[in-house]
C-alpha cells in the first residue's frame, strides 16, 4: 500500500510557522497516519499521537475517513534551534524517548482500540515496524519520505510533498519461509538461507521505493 500527500501538507504546515525539521517530522506523522488509517478499511478516526522528552514533545495526527486530516506539533523552540545548530535534528533525535499511541475510533457505539509502542531514540518508521512486529508478527516494511519541492509554473514556490509505503508478506507466502533476515520471518537464521532470494527481495523493495513519487493524488 502506498499513499502520497501534497496540498493537504501545504494547507496544514504553514499555519503554525513550524521550524523546517519540526514541519518535516509532522509531515511524516501525517503520512504515516493516512497510510495506516486507509489500510484498515473502516469508518471513523485513526489517531497517531506521540509524547516524548525530546525537543518535539508531542505530535498529533487525526485522520477521519474518508479524506479528513488534521495535525499539530508541540515543541520547545529553543531546544529545536539548539538541535539544528548542533546538527542533531533528525526525526529520532527530535522525538527522544517516550511513547507512540495508535488509536482506532469507530464512534461512540463501538469500542476504541489502541496500540502503544515505545519510542527509544527511534524514528516513526522504526516505531511502525515495531508495532507490526508486536501486533501482527508479520514481516513488514514501512518507508516514509518527506521533501520540499519547487513546482514548475507556480512562481518557483516550494511545496511540501510526502509519501509512505507499507509492504507485508501474506501469512502463507512461501517467501516468508525463505527470508530469515526479515523481522517476523519464520525461516531459520542459519539453515536454508539463500542469499540470492534475499537479494532479490531487497531489490524488489528498492524498486518499489524508487517508484514511489511524492505527488498528491486526488
Language model feature labels by segment:
Residues 1-185, 201:
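Interaction interfaces in information-processing and related assembly proteins
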Residues 207, 217:
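Short Cys/His-rich Zn2+-coordinating modules
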